[in-house]
Each structure stands twice: as C-alpha cells, then as structure tokens.
C-alpha cells in the first residue's frame, strides 16, 4: 500500500476545504482541485472525509451548503477509495444526526433538503455495489421514518465512477524483467498500474492527469511507452493480463485495460461520458428544429480514411456555398439595415402623435439565433478548445463534432444578418444619444439664464446688500426693561453698592479704547441740553425711590481697564473747562434737580468750605469712596468752575489717596446727601480712617476723576443732621 501521505498534505487540504466552504459563492474550480487531490491519493481518504464532516457540522448554513456541494463533487470525482469512506457508518450517521437534531441544533430547511437530496442521489448511484450498500440502507430507513425526499432523479452508476490510482501490488521479483529484489536492487511501484519494478524498469516519470496526478511521478517503461506513443496500441493483452490478476470485478478490469490507451484514458472518464451525452442531446434538438443534418445510424462505423475524404469533399462544397451565402447575406444586411433604421426614425418622429395610432411593430427577427443554435455554437467552440490537447486523430473518431460543424456552417448567413441588424440599431441609438445630449445642454443653458436674470432683478433694489452692522462701543447698552434704574451719575451720588476690583485679578479686566475718544461728561449739559450723542441708550438720571434696585447689567457700563493710563489731573481739568462756560449761561438756577449738582444760593459757602478743608479733604473732594462690592468704576460728573483753582494743590495728595480702603463705612442715602449739601457744615471733620494702598496697583492703573466733581458725603454729616 502507498505510504506517501504526510501531515503537511492534510494541513493543506484542510486549508483548501475551509476556503472552498466559506460563506461566499461556490468556487467550482477549487472544488475540482480538491477532488483531484483526493483522487490522486495525496491525502488519506479518511482524513479528507473527516475534514468535510467537520465543515458540514458548522453553525453557518451557508458554510454547510458549500460543504455539502463540495462533498458531492468529491463523491463524483474522488475515486472508489473515497466512496468507501463516504459510505462508512461514521459519515452517514453524522448526516442522519443532523437531520434528526431538534431545538437550537436543528438544521436550516435548505440544509435539511440538501442532505436528503444527496442521500437519495448517492443511494441510487451506488445501487448494486456491495461496498456502498450502507448508503442504500440509510436511504430506506429514512423513507420508513417518514422523511419527504425530493422527486427521484435519474442517476446512472457511472456518475460516481472516476479513474483513481490503482492499489499497489507486492512482489518479490520485478514484474517486467523478473529480477529479484535485494538490498541494492530496490523495489519501486508504477503509479499508473501499481505493479512492482526495479530501478532499471521504472526510471521514467510522467504526469498522470487522467488519475488526478498533475506532477510527474514514477512509471515503468511499458506504461511510459504506451502513454507517450500516440498511435501505439501494443501491449493491450499484457495490460489486461496484469489487470485481471489485480482486480476482482469485470468493471474495474475494463477500466484498467482501457486506461492504458492514450485516447481512452480521457474519453472513458465520466466527464467525457457526460460530454457525449450532451452532444447527443444537442444533435437531437437540432433535428427537432429541422435545421441540421441527420445523424448517421451508426456513428462507430466511420473509418479514419472515409472520414478524411468526406471532410475534404464537404470543405470544397462548402467553399462555394459559403461564398454565395456571404454575398447574399451582405446584400440582405444592407437592405435590412436601411429598413430598420428608417423604421426606428419613423417611430421616434411619431412619438407625439395620438395614442390611437397603430403601435409600431418591430420587423420580424427571422435571422435571430435560437437558444439551441447559440448553445451549439458554444459547445462547438468548447470542443475545439479541448481538441487542442487531445492526441492527433481524435477529431476523426468523433462524428458528433463533424455534425456540429455542418449545422453551424449553415448559421453563417444568420450571423451576418444579425450582425447587420445590431450595427444598424447601434448607429440609430448613437444618433438619438447625440440629440438627447444636445437637448439637455440647451435646457441647462436656459435654466442658467433664467437664474441669472432672477438674481439680477433682486440685486437692483439693493436687497442683496449686507445688513448694516450696529455700532459697537466699549459700553454696553442699558436694559430698556428697567427705565427707572438710576444712571451712572445717580449711582455716584446715591452711594449704591458697586463692584470691588480688589477681588479680581489684574489681567482679567477687558481692554477698552482710550478715554480720549469720548466727550467729557458735563453735568449742566446733561441736565439742560440733550444727552451726549456718544451714549444714545443712556437715560437721564431720575431721582426716584427705586435707586436701590439698579440692575447689575449697568455695572460694566463704564469699565476701565487696568491697562489704561489715567491722564493727569491738570489736563483733565483743562478738558472739562471749555464745556463749563458754554453751559453755564443756560443752566437754570431755579431747577430743583440742578440744585442737587450746584446750588446758586450757596456758591460762596461751598467755595469757603473747600478752601478750609483743602489740606485734609482733598481725596474726598476729588474721588468718591468706592464700596467693596461695586461692579465698576463710575466716572464722576464735572464740577463748577468755582472749584477748579483748588485742584492743583490737591494733586500731590491724590497720588497717595487714589484707592480708598475696602473697610470704609457705607455711604449715606441719597436724601442725606442733598441735606448735607444744602446746609452749612462745620469745619471740623474726622480724618480718613485708613490710607493703605493695595500692592500691584499704582497711580496709572486707575482712571482719574474729573476736576470739578460735586462734593461727596462728608464723614461729619451725622453731626449736621443732629444740628438740624
């Protein structure tokens, strides 16, 4: 028995089986390669069967179907040794177990039907063979159990017959030269016949494709001569003698004897038998259509010499007929082309006509190929390709090929006319395509013109201009929903709680443009004239009782960045000085609101008071006290010109009193301010509580106060109230 199996071959076979049984489409070429590997006995048939069984038990139904199809291909082409493993109890019981599985392990309906179909077809093909009888027993058992099989197909036993390498025969002497085998004269087996030979009689090597062996293997000299000699038929009796001593069945003996012949090695394969059957069926169909020649009664009576003479005669007659047929077909082709093109153009021109018109009927396709004729042409081309690898003279022994050649020769005029019709259709469709492309291009251009006109009309009225941007400034607008909220000047005098900048980092203040871009605030112009146009959203301060409900949105109205450099005090007084004389003549002296800012009846008292308290009260006159929780620095309103000359003497002390302490007492209410300003105050007052400055803030880090701000609250106001 052969011993050239290896684990590497089994591993390669497993990989090929996994690739062939994937969930993708079936690969017929790979299936045939696997069957050739099994037939050539490169791997053990039991290992191949177990690999297929493992893939059949897969959970994926697509993989199971592919594995079943591969198993069927291997059964038909794998040889008798593989059929014995398929008919074993191990494989068949596995299929029956899949059929009887219930619950989650129940097979897919398609897989179940495929298993039943394969068991039925294998049982019918193996009928009459003792070594494959277990398949028939399983089939009958399933029938008795009530399984519904598909309709019985007609399967011949030759469907599972395939040529496989023969079993090796053991002998003590060379079966050709009768030399005994010794330690130096080794024993070798011929892969073609399986007999034992020594080195001298088996030194040749040949591939054996009829046995599924594609690589060159060892053969004896007799088999080498028979396989390579194209016309030699000698040695047939010896071949029969050896095969009869080796096989027990007449069928296997016949196969072994015929496999020695160069032509019979391929013709007697099951595939060639199927091909012969297909040829016969196609010829019968040709006869039914009465377009072919009649098949001879006995095709085996054709001799090579008669066949060659008939081929030459037919070729000569066909040349003259072919010339006449080609000339007639060309004339008909031109006429048919013109007629068909005119009919198509007429149909396209009458598209817009009424539906009651007679429908267009295509010309009769008298010269169109029938499916049977097209199949015969393809079959003839396939046979011609296969004859390239056959020994010479094979074409003479195949009368079916000659019959196909005769029937296809009569189809040449049809092919020519069909080609003409196709070309005319192609030209007409090209013309229609060109017209359609032109119409589409004109339509696109018209749409573009309409769109451009529509957009041009809209642009005339200026609708496509961008919307004007609202002027943005460094100060946010006041909330219009709170008209009674106090303004910036009122916050200054009412003493409302403001943000304390001592709790915020230095670099978090938003940068603002320089103060020189804005007009200085004039208290009299804000009271008499219209508001400054630089602040259109700011309302005039209203002295109402709702001063304590100022919204926090007003807090960042006058934010001053720490990066700004405050202008000097004299320069600020000079900026505010020109606006004061202009508004002084028109200032109403009898206005109670204006009396809050300056009292005409007490100018001398204020001047005298400021002259007496200039050394100590300079920080309070020039800057209001800032509470701890304020949100922004509020710019103070300008002061009357009467207090302007006092400012130069106050400048040196302002550098030390720039930032008031956060521990300062809260400011007094609004009405206390007005009472304190309208009544004379005693010159005695308390000194400032604390003059410490915060580290990291210098004089330039805070904005300078206007020079003529009204006098804020005095620390001794309570004494004045007590006197009142």
Swiss-Prot record:
Zinc finger (FYVE-type) boundaries: 168-228
Main location: membrane
Biased composition (Low complexity): 566-581, 602-619, 641-658
PROSITE patterns with a match to the protein in the record: UIM (PS50330), VHS (PS50179), ZF_FYVE (PS50178)
Compartment(s): Endosome membrane
Protein's job: Component of the ESCRT-0 complex which is the sorting receptor for ubiquitinated cargo proteins at the multivesicular body (MVB) and recruits ESCRT-I to the MVB outer membrane.
Homology family: Belongs to the VPS27 family.
Protein's name according to its UniProt entry: Vacuolar protein sorting-associated protein 27
Organism whose genome encodes this protein: Neurospora crassa (strain ATCC 24698 / 74-OR23-1A / CBS 708.71 / DSM 1257 / FGSC 987)
């Amino acid at each position: 028995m052969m011993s050239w199996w290896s684990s590497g071959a089994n591993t390669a076979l497993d990989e090929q089986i996994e690739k062939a049984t994937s969930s993708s489409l079936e690969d017929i070429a790979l299936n045939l390669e696997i069957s050739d590997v099994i037939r050539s006995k490169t791997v053990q048939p039991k290992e191949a069967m177990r690999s297929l069984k493992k893939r059949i038990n897969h959970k994926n139904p697509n993989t199971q179907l592919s594995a079943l199809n591969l198993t069927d291909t291997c059964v038909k082409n794998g040889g008798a040794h593989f059929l014995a493993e398929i008919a074993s109890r191990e494989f068949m019981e596995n299929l029956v177990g899949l059929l009887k599985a219930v619950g989650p392990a129940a097979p897919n309906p398609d897989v179940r039907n495929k298993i039943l179909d394969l068991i039925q077809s294998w049982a019918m093909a193996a009928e009459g063979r003792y070594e494959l009888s277990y398949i028939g027993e399983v089939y009958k058992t399933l029938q008795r159990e009530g399984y519904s099989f598909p309709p019985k197909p007609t399967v011949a036993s030759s469907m599972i017959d395939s040529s496989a390498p023969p079993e090796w025969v053991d002998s003590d002497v060379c079966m050709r030269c009768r030399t005994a085998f010794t330690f130096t004269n080794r024993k070798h087996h011929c892969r073609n016949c399986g007999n034992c030979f020594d080195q001298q009689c088996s030194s040749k090597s040949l591939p054996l494709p009829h046995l599924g062996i594609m690589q060159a293997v060892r053969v004896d000299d007799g088999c080498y001569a028979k396989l390579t000699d194209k016309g030699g038929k000698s040695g047939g009796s010896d071949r029969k003698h050896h095969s009869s001593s080796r096989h027990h069945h007449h069928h296997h003996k016949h196969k072994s004897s015929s496999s020695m012949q160069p032509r019979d090695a391929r013709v007697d394969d099951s595939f060639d038998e199927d091909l012969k059957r297909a040829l016969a069926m196609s010829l019968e169909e040709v006869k039914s259509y009465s377009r072919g020649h009649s098949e001879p009664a006995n095709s085996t009576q054709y001799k090579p010499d008669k066949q060659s003479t008939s081929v030459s005669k037919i070729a000569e007659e066909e040349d003259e007929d072919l010339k006449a047929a080609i000339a007639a077909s060309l004339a008909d082709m031109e006429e048919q082309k013109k007629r068909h093109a005119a009919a198509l153009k007429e149909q396209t021109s009458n598209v817009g006509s009424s539906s009651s018109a007679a429908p267009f009927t295509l010309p009769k396709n008298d010269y169109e190929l029938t499916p049977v004729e097209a199949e015969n042409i393809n079959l003839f081309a396939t046979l011609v390709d296969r004859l390239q690898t056959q020994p010479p003279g094979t074409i003479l022994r195949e009368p079916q090929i000659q019959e196909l050649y005769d029937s296809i020769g009569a189809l040449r005029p049809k092919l020519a006319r069909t080609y003409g019709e196709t070309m005319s259709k192609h030209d007409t469709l090209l013309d229609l395509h060109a017209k359609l492309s032109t119409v589409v291009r004109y339509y696109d251009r018209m749409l573009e013109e309409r769109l451009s006109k529509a957009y041009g009309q809209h642009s005339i009225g200026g609708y496509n201009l961008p919307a004007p941007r609202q002027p943005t400034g460094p100060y946010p607008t006041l909330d219009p929903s709170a008209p009674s909220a106090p303004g910036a000047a009122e916050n200054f005098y009412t003493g409302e709680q403001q943000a304390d900048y001592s709790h915020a980092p230095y670099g978090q203040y938003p940068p603002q443009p320089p103060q020189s871009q804005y007009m200085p605030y004039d208290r009299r112009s804000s009271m008499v004239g219209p508001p400054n146009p630089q602040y259109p959203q700011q309302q005039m301060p209203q002295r109402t009782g709702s001063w304590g409900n100022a919204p926090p949105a007003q807090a960042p109205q006058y934010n001053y960045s720490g990066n700004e450099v405050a202008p000097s005090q004299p320069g600020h007084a000079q900026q505010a000085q020109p606006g004061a004389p202009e508004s002084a003549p028109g200032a109403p002296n009898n206005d109670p609101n204006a009396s809050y800012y300056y009292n005409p009846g007490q100018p001398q008292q204020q001047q005298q008071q400021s002259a007496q308290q200039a050394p100590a009260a300079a920080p309070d006159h020039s800057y209001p006290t800032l509470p701890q929780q304020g949100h922004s620095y509020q710019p103070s309103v300008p002061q009357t010109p009467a207090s302007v000359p006092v400012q130069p003497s106050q400048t040196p002390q302002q550098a030390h009193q720039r930032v008031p302490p956060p521990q300062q007492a809260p400011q007094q209410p609004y009405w206390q301010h007005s009472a304190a300003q309208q009544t004379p105050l005693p010159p005695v007052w308390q000194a400032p509580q604390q003059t410490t400055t915060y580290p990291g803030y210098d004089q330039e880090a805070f904005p300078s106060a206007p020079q003529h701000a009204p006098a804020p609250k005095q620390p001794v106001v309570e004494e004045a109230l007590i006197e009142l």
